[in-house]
């Protein structure tokens, strides 16, 4: 190839190729599909979540954004819970992101707090138990989405375990990012107003025909499988407990010379006091004891009410 010929070779514009192959659409077309999906969320999701939580959850369309998928996800910011989902015969890889404040408020409501009395929580990463509680919420969003799209076969969506945005792996620079759209919805519980986003490749949205099914989720009084799953998640969530016993005070000189096999007595001669904690929070005042061949602690007092302890464990 001559120098003059090489100088006339130009790389194809990536956006142009994406438009030619159906991977990028006009904002007007994408916006129309986003609005249709938002109308289904607005129509069905409040009823689904109200029947599960007993709370009046408000849903409203907050607009849409377009761009590269990884950039749209990064723009959600910190304090967001993310989930990777797929729906056979519709989209093999899409994401849902939800601001943490409304999920924290939902946990408070499930623990018995009046939604109207919940103060707006600050965005933060969620604990393992809070994520356990949030998982069925992601299932609810996915189920409403399933009712809205034309996915043949009636397959159920696959919802990966949600994770905090700070834990999301960095994109592989070798893999080319895809053009996507973020459908943004506000979700309100009491005075707490947050946003959840559904991020879908534009190639999928351009082929999507939205079908509204008004009958879905109309029975708000029925205790559904979603509720049972939520309760089971909470019941089966394991909590690591720690016990702390005060030992006899030692001088710095003695402490520095301790060797393997040396014994340090408990501070309390009788009724040895044990502080039991979880997630860095003191929960119970206990008494050290023994049952058969196992050492145990007996609860003697609590640090707060049952609701206080649950909130400490969940946070």
Swiss-Prot record:
Membrane topology: Peripheral membrane protein
Major location category of this protein: membrane
Pfam family, one: FliMN_C
GO cellular component: bacterial-type flagellum basal body; plasma membrane
SUPFAM superfamilies listed in its UniProt record: Surface presentation of antigens (SPOA)
Keywords: Bacterial flagellum, Cell inner membrane, Cell membrane, Chemotaxis, Flagellar rotation, Membrane
Source domain of life: Bacteria
Name of the protein in question: Flagellar motor switch protein FliM
Subcellular location: Cell inner membrane; Bacterial flagellum basal body
Entry similarity comment: Belongs to the FliM family.
Keyword hit for Cytoplasm: no
GO biological processes: bacterial-type flagellum-dependent swarming motility; positive chemotaxis
Described purpose of this protein according to its UniProt entry: FliM is one of three proteins (FliG, FliN, FliM) that forms the rotor-mounted switch complex (C ring), located at the base of the basal body. This complex interacts with the CheY and CheZ chemotaxis proteins, in addition to contacting components of the motor that determine the direction of flagellar rotation.
Listed InterPro entries: CheC-like_sf (IPR028976), FliN-like_C (IPR001543), SpoA-like_sf (IPR036429)
């Amino acid at each position: 190839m001559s120098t003059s010929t090489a100088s006339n070779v130009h790389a194809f514009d990536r956006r142009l190729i994406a438009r030619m192959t159906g991977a990028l659409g006009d904002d007007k077309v994408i916006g129309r599909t986003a609005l249709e999906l938002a109308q289904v969320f607005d129509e069905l999701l409040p009823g689904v979540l109200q029947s599960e939580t007993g709370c009046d959850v408000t849903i409203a369309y907050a607009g849409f954004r377009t761009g590269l998928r990884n950039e749209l996800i990064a723009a959600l910011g910190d304090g967001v819970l993310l989930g990777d989902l797929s729906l056979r015969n519709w989209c093999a890889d899409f994401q849902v992101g939800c601001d943490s404040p409304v999920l924290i408020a939902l946990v408070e409501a499930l623990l018995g707090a009046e939604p109207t009395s919940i103060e707006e929580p600050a965005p933060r990463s969620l604990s393992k138990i809070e994520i356990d509680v949030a998982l069925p919420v992601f299932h609810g969003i996915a189920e409403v989405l399933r009712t809205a799209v034309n996915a043949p076969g009636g397959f159920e969506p696959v919802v990966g375990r949600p994770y905090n945005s700070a834990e999301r792996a960095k994109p592989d620079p070798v893999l080319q990012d895809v053009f996507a759209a973020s459908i943004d919805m506000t979700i309100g519980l009491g005075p707490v107003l947050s946003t959840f986003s559904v991020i879908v490749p534009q190639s999928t949205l351009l082929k999507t025909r939205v079908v509204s099914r008004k009958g879905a989720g109309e029975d708000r009084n029925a205790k559904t499988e979603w509720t049972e799953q939520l309760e089971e998640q909470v019941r089966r969530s394991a909590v690591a407990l720690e016990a702390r016993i005060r030992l006899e005070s030692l001088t710095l000189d003695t402490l520095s010379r301790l060797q393997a096999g040396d014994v340090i007595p408990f501070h309390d001669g009788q009724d040895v006091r044990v502080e039991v904690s979880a997630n860095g929070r003191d929960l119970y005042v206990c008494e050290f004891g023994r049952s058969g061949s196992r050492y145990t602690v007996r609860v003697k007092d609590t640090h707060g009410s049952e609701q206080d302890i649950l909130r400490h464990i969940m946070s």
